[in-house]
């Protein structure tokens, strides 16, 4: 199991300057961005940076070369984690056309599953909800909305009698600039606590919105587990509470397929972040089925997120 691995990669902006490396006795730069690739164990706890290059997009050719080199030294690549900003990679592999895996070039019997980064997707859910608003089905042809004003209303109502969401503040909905890069504020907004607060303060008037927030929360917990066992089924490793975890993924799939944007309700075509969520759900189920054949019983899904930026700090 130690050789079962996932590739994650990220293209990061850097200060455009010229630097002299004293140890290598060479000059680097100027460069606007750096491409970093990391391999990490999916079952065993290890990770290693294997590629760094400047002004380099992740392409299909480069990715397959990296996979082949890993496989040659005995590392089995089962998945690839990335954010939705890798346009060249996404386009060349036709990921937005519902392609969620490719045959492994070293062993066509195994697949490499694509995983758009769950924290990045959560931030995009938050951004679109606050900026455009979501329109959600409420049965019998009716709809309800969920957007900035609804969260603002909750924040102002919470605390008048009892404060259910102590972490939720105006900063969570007035996010601009670099603040939008923080995953924790998006997680607070779409948390189980927020879901319960909507129900407590507004009763059945916000029943649909409360359920949607909880659906997002369960999906993110399922895609971000870091311990084998947890009091919350969705926070346990994937496979430990398989029935409830699979149900959480399919609930999110249904929610994403049915949601519309309040500024353009008639538009039914999915945009990039919605497709990314649907791809990640299909990949999680497919990857787990593949790993089961090798005797793997559970997966810590946090190892399927993009983690390269942490290595650069």
Over which residues does each language-model region extend?
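Non-catalytic regulatory appendages
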Residues: 34, 47-313
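Structured nucleic-acid-interacting core domains from mobile-element enzymes and related host factors
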Residues: 1-44
């Amino acid at each position: 199991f130690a050789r079962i691995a996932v590739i994650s990669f990220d293209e990061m902006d850097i200060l455009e300057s010229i630097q002299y490396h004293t140890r290598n006795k060479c000059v680097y730069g100027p460069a606007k961005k750096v491409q970093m690739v990391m391999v990490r164990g999916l079952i065993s706890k290890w990770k290693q940076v294997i590629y760094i290059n400047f002004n380099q997009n992740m392409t299909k050719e480069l990715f397959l070369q990296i996979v082949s080199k890993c496989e040659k030294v005995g590392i089995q690549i089962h998945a690839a984690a990335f954010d939705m900003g890798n346009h060249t990679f996404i386009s060349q592999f036709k990921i937005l056309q519902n392609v969620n895996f490719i045959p492994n070039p070293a062993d066509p019997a195994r697949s490499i599953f694509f995983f758009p980064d769950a924290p990045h997707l959560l931030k995009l859910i938050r951004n679109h909800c606050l900026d455009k608003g979501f329109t959600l089905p409420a049965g019998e042809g009716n709809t309800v909305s969920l957007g900035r004003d609804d969260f603002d209303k909750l924040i102002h109502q919470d605390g008048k009698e009892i404060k259910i969401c102590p972490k939720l503040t105006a900063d969570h909905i007035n996010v601009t600039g670099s603040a939008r890069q923080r995953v924790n504020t998006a997680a607070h907004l779409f948390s189980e606590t927020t879901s319960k607060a909507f129900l407590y303060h507004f009763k059945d008037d916000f029943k649909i919105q409360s359920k949607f927030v909880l659906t997002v929360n369960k999906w993110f917990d399922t895609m971000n587990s870091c311990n084998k066992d947890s009091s919350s089924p969705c926070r346990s490793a994937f496979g430990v509470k398989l029935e409830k975890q699979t149900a959480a993924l399919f609930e999110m799939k249904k929610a994403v397929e049915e949601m519309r944007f309040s500024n353009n309700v008639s538009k039914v075509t999915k945009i990039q972040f919605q497709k990314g969520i649907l791809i990640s759900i299909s990949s999680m189920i497919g990857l787990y089925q593949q790993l089961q054949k090798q005797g793997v019983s559970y997966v810590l899904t946090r190892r399927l997120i993009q983690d390269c930026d942490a290595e650069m700090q």
